[in-house]
């Protein structure tokens, strides 16, 4: 779920209600003898443009952008504009398949953020506005303040979780798109990062393609000695024994739609799993392992749906926090009753993914991959206090209550940003290829996992323990 590229597709109000404006712009580019400006429009326009930085990296000021167009009509001519400035002197022309490939240079003085690019299409005519994300370049800094120890594990590392009782670290891995045939749950020694146990999930039912119940999200239940995982591809969750990773229960496919995160309240005996892309959090009983009860979150935005992404649990206060991937909101849930206490707008973000919480300041930390920033929200007032540019593609965030610092994985930048509760960037640490997830052990140690770019990538598929020097 990285953000090294951007899908530039017209949606809703971005579509061509701007035909009159385009007609006026076209007058400056046509001769007096040109054809009618208001020609027949493309009533079934579906064109999309995908933009990607060099070799899959972030799009930044001065970088060369690779464009891939699709779903245009053969022969359509595409001109890109920023304001009144034409970005491609010669129009791109869709081939017989309705596609085109091109490159575009981002100006060296381009401001960071979502740049509104106008897509002017002719033959037949259409228009759309799309956001081209220009990511910040945040230099590595203050690396001497942290000791780093890394270990290469399995391909496709996804998440990790730490047992407060034993110090063991549990890591999930899954490789590729369906059918996913390679996936593991690993148990590590928290000190040495040595693998103490590992297991491959059971084969997925109803298929003969070799796919398994691939594991993605992970949460630790120290009260019952279990570890919970999400089976995103099968819309399910599973429970394993911490001691030897033997399977306790595999829930049926369809139990939790696109299950992502899972967190445990050991005192209440409840597990919560996010149904990504829906407004639902599934609530389980960790003793009976019965079918879950759904918690529905309603968006404050009229006509919009809260889309649950990551979860964070404050076990001491029995409060559950969730962020919405689609509506720039966060929700507070009472874990005791399973009811939503409030939904709060988060200003200045797009595509929120990660969430963490600081009980001392009552502040929520929201990592947003669509806007390349970390938002810090005061839950008492509901105000967004700070927005910190951390790098390209912030994906997850964890807050360490010992050193009182938030840690953000920037998937495309390949860094781990360290931010204090007041929005100050304390450090920006190298974290290999595609950092995916970060967690803390409550003792000052931080564990981050990343994914490799390929089989020969020495910097990927690693877990790294970051420990403050002082």
Question: How would you name each of these model-derived features?
Answer:
Residues 1-33:
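Gram-negative bacterial Sec-dependent N-terminal signal peptides
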Residues 35-470:
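Predominantly soluble domains enriched in secretory-pathway, periplasmic, or organellar proteins
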């Amino acid at each position: 779920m990285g953000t090294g590229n951007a899908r530039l597709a017209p949606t809703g109000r971005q579509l061509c209600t701007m035909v009159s404006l385009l007609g006026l712009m076209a007058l400056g580019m046509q001769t007096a003898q040109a054809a009618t400006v208001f020609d027949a429009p493309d009533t079934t326009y579906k064109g999309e443009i995908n933009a990607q930085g060099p070799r899959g990296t972030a799009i930044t000021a001065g970088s060369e952008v690779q464009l891939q167009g699709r779903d245009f009509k053969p022969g359509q001519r595409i001109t890109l504009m920023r304001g009144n400035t034409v970005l491609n002197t010669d129009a791109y022309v869709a081939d017989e398949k309705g596609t085109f490939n091109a490159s575009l240079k981002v100006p060296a003085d381009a401001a960071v953020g979502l740049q509104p690019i106008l897509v002017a299409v002719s033959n037949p005519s259409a228009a759309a506005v799309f956001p081209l994300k220009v990511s910040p370049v945040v230099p590595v800094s203050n690396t001497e303040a942290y000791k780093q120890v890394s270990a290469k594990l399995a391909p496709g590392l996804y998440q990790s979780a730490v047992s407060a009782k034993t110090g063991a670290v549990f890591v999930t891995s899954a490789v590729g798109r369906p059918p996913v045939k390679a996936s593991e749950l690993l148990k590590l020694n928290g000190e040495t990062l040595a693998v103490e146990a590992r297991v491959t999930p059971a084969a997925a039912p109803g298929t003969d393609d070799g796919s398994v119940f691939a594991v993605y999200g992970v949460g630790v239940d120290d009260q019952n000695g279990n570890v919970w995982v999400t089976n995103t591809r099968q819309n399910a969750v599973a429970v394993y024994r911490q001691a030897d990773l033997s399977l306790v229960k595999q829930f049926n496919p369809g139990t939790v739609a696109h299950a992502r995160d899972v967190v445990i309240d050991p005192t209440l005996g409840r597990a919560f799993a996010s149904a990504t892309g829906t407004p639902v959090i599934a609530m389980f009983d960790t003793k009976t392992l019965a079918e879950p009860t759904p918690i529905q979150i309603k968006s404050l935005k009229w006509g919009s749906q809260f889309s649950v992404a990551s979860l964070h649990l404050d076990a001491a206060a029995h409060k559950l926090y969730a962020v919405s991937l689609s509506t720039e909101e966060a929700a507070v849930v009472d874990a005791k009753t399973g009811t939503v206490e409030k939904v709060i707008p988060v200003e200045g973000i797009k595509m929120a993914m990660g969430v963490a919480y600081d009980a001392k300041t009552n502040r929520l930390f929201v990592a947003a991959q669509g806007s390349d920033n970390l938002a810090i929200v005061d839950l008492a007032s509901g105000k967004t206090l700070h927005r910190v540019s951390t790098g390209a593609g912030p994906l997850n965030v964890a807050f360490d209550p010992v050193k009182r610092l938030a840690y953000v994985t920037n998937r495309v930048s390949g860094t781990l940003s360290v931010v204090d509760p007041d929005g100050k960037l304390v450090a920006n640490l190298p974290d290999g290829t595609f950092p995916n997830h970060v967690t803390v052990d409550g003792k000052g140690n931080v564990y981050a996992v990343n994914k490799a770019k390929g089989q020969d990538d020495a910097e990927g598929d690693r877990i790294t323990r970051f420990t403050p020097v002082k």
